[in-house]
């Protein structure tokens, strides 16, 4: 069985002091959470800056970390130009005080992207030791296929939204050849495509229902799901958020949930979901309790 892991999403650490961020990062490392997810737009780069200050104070942390950042989103448009990608990566590395990125993701698709130009940017970053691996976020299988046909540095990661509630990428696989709305293929079979091509899936917002509702944990709109989460949390001796994490980890794609908490308490609660191996009945029970159905 593959090792299960979490990543700490750093989108909200701009609201923390350097001391608070240091406590959170130390807690993560001490509990084998070594993957840290950033983006150039998070906190208008304040998140990267605070993280970098923590690394200045604790230079030994770097060798224990996988640091990922993303670029491409601008105010009102997307930009995958060679100049933009290279400029943003260099600034991320400077602010993060990390010398290189372990992973760079292109942040959502750019409809105007010149993939040959992206290829030049990726080659430059790789050959100059600035980025080790590359990936994308929120792309479907055909988009990744197109990039990988032209890129020398292949796409090895795809970060997509996934939770028990926001799980249409799973539903579309269950409803193959059916007439229900769940059968609509919005991702090009992205889970199966990534598994076939050894592309690691990162699941963002693993405890969120949707932007309008926020988290489904203890949300009265999702009472049946919370009843099931409570039942399983009692059985396994953990909090509901740990069960929500274990639901994602149970999938054979061996995904990495990106948990965007700034609370050490919540982080430690979710870490306890790593060793939990839900039964098929429990996994499908959560899926159904969230309002989904089976064909």
Task: Put a short name on every predicted segment.
Residues 1-65, 127, 209:
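N-terminal binding-site loop/beta-alpha segment at the start of enzyme catalytic domains
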Residues 33, 98-101, 131, 155:
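A structural motif
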Residues 113-295:
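Beta/alpha (TIM)-barrel catalytic core signal, keyed to glycine-rich beta->alpha loops juxtaposed to Asp/Glu
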Residues 93-114:
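Active-site groove signature of glycoside hydrolases
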Residues 9-19, 71-83, 112:
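Active-site mouth loops of central-metabolism enzymes
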């Amino acid at each position: 069985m593959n090792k299960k892991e979490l990543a700490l999403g750093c989108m909200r650490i701009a609201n923390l002091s350097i001391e608070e961020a240091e406590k959170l990062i130390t807690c993560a490392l001490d509990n084998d959470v070594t993957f840290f997810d950033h983006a150039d737009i998070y906190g208008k780069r304040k998140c990267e800056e605070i993280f970098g200050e923590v690394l200045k104070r604790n230079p030994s942390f770097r060798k224990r970390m996988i640091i990922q950042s993303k670029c491409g989103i601008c105010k009102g448009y997307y930009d995958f130009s060679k100049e933009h990608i290279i400029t943003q990566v260099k600034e991320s590395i400077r602010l993060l005080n990390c010398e290189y990125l372990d992973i760079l993701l292109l942040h959502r698709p750019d409809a105007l992207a010149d993939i040959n130009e992206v290829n030049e940017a990726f080659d430059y970053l790789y050959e100059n030791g600035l980025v080790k691996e590359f990936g994308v976020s929120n792309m479907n299988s055909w988009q990744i296929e197109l990039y990988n046909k032209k890129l020398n540095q292949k796409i090895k990661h795809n970060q997509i939204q996934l939770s028990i509630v926001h799980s249409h990428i799973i539903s579309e696989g269950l409803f193959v050849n059916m007439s229900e709305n769940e059968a609509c293929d919005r991702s090009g079979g992205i889970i199966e495509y990534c598994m076939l091509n050894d592309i690691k899936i990162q699941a963002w917002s693993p405890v969120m229902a949707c932007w309008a509702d926020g988290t489904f944990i203890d949300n009265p709109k999702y009472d049946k799901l919370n009843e099931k989460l409570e039942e399983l949390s009692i059985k396994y001796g953990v909090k509901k958020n740990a069960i929500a994490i274990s639901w994602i980890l149970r999938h054979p794609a061996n995904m990495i949930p990106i948990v965007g908490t700034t609370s050490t308490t919540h982080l430690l609660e979710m870490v306890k979901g790593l060793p939990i191996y839900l039964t098929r009945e429990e996994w499908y029970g959560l899926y159904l309790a969230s309002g989904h159905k089976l064909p």
